[in-house]
Amino acid sequence: IWVGMISVVLFSACKTGTSRSLGEGNRGNPLPDRPNILWLVTEDMGAYISPFGDSSAVIPNLNRLAKEGVVYTNLYSTSGVCAPSRAAIATGMYPSSIGANHMRTSSYSEVTGLPKYEAVPGPDVKMVSELLRIHGYFTSNNYKEDYQFNAPVTAWDENGPYAHWRNRAEDQPFYSIFNFTTTHESGLFEPYGFRNIEMRHYHSGDTTYKWEPGNLTEEETPVHVSKDQEFEVPPYLPNTPIVQRDMWKLYNNISEMDNQVGAILAQLEEDGLLENTIIVFYGDHGGPLPREKRLIYDSGLNTPMIIRFPDSWRAGTTDDQLISFVDFAPTLLSLIGEKPLNYMQGQAFLGDYQAKEERKYIHGAADRFDEVTDAIRAVRDPQFKYIRNYRPNQGYYLPLAYREQIPTMQELLRLNEAGELNAIQAQWFRESKPKEELYDCLADPFELHNLADDPAYQDKLKDLSLEMDRWLTNIGDTPNLPEIDLIHRLWAGDKKPTTADPQINISNGKVAIESDTEGASIGYKLINAIGEQSASWSIYKKPINLKKGESIWVQAHRIGYNPSAIIKQNLN
């Protein structure tokens, strides 16, 4: 049973009648021809759960997923923060190759003096959710987006706090995402209390359920983990009562998120969909604590992933292959039997088009975060990580107002000012950085001992430096490029481009639509004679048959551009 706060639903499942293999290296495993795909995405999630060695949180649902699925130990985000990483997930491209690397593109302009802008991928790039819609899938997102660009109206069948696979057509396969924000770093702020909106997961899809703004009080917030427990603290943080309280909040938040995950999975079982659904749980980057989030050490990039496949395939096993967020989009296509698109910079790790060789490296980047800017790049193989600092005269720690609401961050600053941090804890506050860093991530998992100047490791340093050069050239990344120059490059000028209005042509009872903007997605809605319209926008693929008295709304949108106006035309 999946364990949730509101209800426990007993097992009920059905199986599809046809199947495919999960790809090379996965022979003998049946996969439904059109598998449903359910993503359970939590925020700011380091390896703080028992399938990854930490048993402090109470997570019966994730433990069941791990028992019935595959634990992936080496998943890495492309950035230590959400929006750039989510851009990689949505497109299959590295954020710094499409202008999505600064956090965020559309905020803090009053501090930076920069215009608001969006990432601008090439004209052939579509969100992977739109690609799945094109292939007949119902796609829903509940409900965070945050891609560094505004999603076109064609991206989702449903997007919002009530979005749910239950709203699809009968027997239509689905790709549904549920986002859980209880584990976000803001969940460590004081006063402590769960966000009311997150309680929607216990009523998922129920449009009659409403929630109050703001948070529960601490007295109202469920206690899943004892406040009296003594928690292990990472060596880069001081072990003080303030930090212990933040560790309790972290584990209590994870335990609450597990309950919410259980509520969604209970609905999946209730609908009889467990055995033709691929369930993927992962975090949007590493942990929420200082010296975790926003950094490109493993504490900021490495995040848990568990995948449960139909029919208990590889149940209870561990997979240590390197996986990057840019691999998600090609893998989604591969799992539904479609070839990944050429522009995608990742590779499929499952499905019909699984890459013949496992990934040899993962890559990461850190640039502007809110009001402060750095320029760091990283490459990691299964054992070693190489980091290149493009602003070595600038310290590691940068004063970020949002992060300084975390009591642990305030404690670090207080103890640093008083000279009471030990040598490891004080590393982050050095006023300059070496140009290069090299870490043995197996012997030194917290990346505290830089080997870049050690003669014994010069061959590895050179190898990873060459790999970084290859990667930067391949994706067109120019680290430390002034952000205003990046904006002008994306816009091909000093003004944000706007998608051309779609042109509607009616002939012989059919509507043909086109846009002069290369690569624009075109969405449309049909409105019948009494004004009824569909809830979602359809993707225009070919001329549309008309019905007498209908009218049509059309919008074109290339990712990163302003969308066109909505063109409305009566079809009488």
Pin down the residues of each PLM region.
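A short aromatic-rich beta-strand->coil structural motif
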Residues: I37, E43, L332, K385-E411, ...
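Active-site segment of extracytoplasmic enzymes that catalyze sulfate/phosphate-ester chemistry
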Residues: R20-E24, W39-V41, G46-D124, L131-Y137
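Short, solvent-exposed turn/loop segments enriched in Gly/Ser/Thr/Pro and often Arg
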Residues: P51-V58, V71-M93, N101-S107, N141-A151, ...
